[in-house]
Each structure stands twice: as structure tokens, then as C-alpha cells.
């Protein structure tokens, strides 16, 4: 189902949601951190989704053990490097990794700006080693409030040339986008792209707000757009992309089953929607699974899956020249 003549991308992928269970074990031992289990087999139920979670907030708790072992900036650098290694192993040509440095820093009071620098270093080294192209998206974790998000924003701005876009993630219902208008104004002033998690836990009004008030060029998840025909028309007309994450939306109980996922409808409506993983380490999936198992189960035809793959590159925060070069590089192989 993957067209090997086209670039394979993953543009909605959380770096801090893709910490290997084996790495969690090893860092736990290295830093003498108490874990809920002491073998890979017994640890996995604590760090990966085994059964669907009742809601988004419950799902997010599965990420916590991964960041609890980030006891140093070297640990942050390691997981960033391993994220690129994982991307290469699964055949990705281009990946946009998003991360919340405040979340990664929290368990061991690491300097937030230091986490940003460590992630940049790890990703740069990974790209050099494995030949994958990557860009970084800074996440503000709305769940921690406006002041904490301000701290994250300042850390990103200190490395503004290495950050491509700003995102807002976390408890969408409890912390609406309206709380973060000034943050996004500064992001746009810095010349960054904007993508926002919206329409996952909250309704279509959250997507409208992300676009109109925060300046979103892309929407993360966006499943609730299906409830608003005018919104779907607007997304298609304005070419505002939806970063679809099929398995994730089932595991968070955002969508009841893959057959009910709106991605097929979005594509039929002319919306620029792509296929992505979200938190592959926590979900126990990879991009190949999303294309070859999840997408067909969501009712997508072979041509629709190919269109979603094309959309992934078209939606990417790359220049026209960078996209052309990537297409040519893959075609030459």
C-alpha cells in the first residue's frame, strides 16, 4: 500500500511519545529510577497501550514512564537520536518530530532550554548517521498552563533557527486555544509555521479557533471536523491540512473503530489529509502498520492511500525546493 516511488513522511510524530521500552529499562537502571517492572515483557503493559483507553487524558498517562527516566540532558539526547534511528528503520524519508521540553524536563527539573538544545543535538546526529531528513516542531503543553507554556516558548525562541513550527497539545477541553493567543503571535513573528492539536477531544469549534485565532496552517487529528460541513469546505478550499493518526484515535477512544474514522470522508471531500503515527512507542505501531493495516481497515482505497502519502509531503513544512529535491532523491532510487 506504500508507493515506494514517493517520499514516505510522518509529520505528526511525538518524540517524547516514542521512547523505546528497552531504553526506558536501561535509563531506569542507569539512573537508579524505580520502574513498575524490571523486564521488557512486564514493563510493556505500563508503557504501551494494550487495550483502548477511555479518553485522551488516560492515554497520555502511558507516556509518563518514558519521560520519568529522562534524568539528564544526555538521556534526552539519546532518545532524540533513537527517534531518528527508528524513523530510518521504518523507511521514512522525512519526519517532523514534535516535543514538549517542559514535559521532558519535569520529572528531574532539567533546564527547559537545555532539553531543547539536547533534542536538537540528538536529532542532528541521527540525521547525519541515518540519512533521514527531519525538522523539529516545538510543543507547548497546554495542560501545564499559560506560564509553563511561556517558558517552553522562550526555550524554543532561544533556538529559533532549529525550530520549524509551534504546536499546542494536551488537555484540549480544559485549556482551550484562546488562552494562548499571545504565544502564537510571537511564534508567527519568529517566522514559524503553526500546527495545533484540535478537534480530537473537543468539537469543531476548537478547529475553527485554531485556524482563526492561532493561525493554524495544519490541524493535528481534527477528527471532529466531520461534524461541521462548512468547516470541511473551508479546510478543502484553504488547503489547511489534517494530520490524521488512525490507530491513535482508536486507542484514545476519540473514534470507536477504524471503519468509522473520518479520514476517508476527508479525502473524498478534497481535504489535504495525511497518514501519521502520533506516539508510535506508546501505541506499539509504526508508519508501515498505519499504511498497510490501519488505512485499509479505515476503508481507504489503494488510490486514497497513495493520495494521503502525496499529501504528507505537500503538507510538510518544507520549501517547494526541498520538496522537489526529496521527490527526486526518492525517484532516483
From Swiss-Prot:
It comes from the Bacteria. One of its GO terms (molecular function) is adenosine deaminase activity. CDD domains: ADA. Gene3D superfamilies: Metal-dependent hydrolases. The active site is at residue 200. Pfam families: A_deaminase. Binds 1 zinc ion per subunit. Catalyzes the hydrolytic deamination of adenosine and 2-deoxyadenosine. This is Adenosine deaminase. It comes from Shigella dysenteriae serotype 1 (strain Sd197).
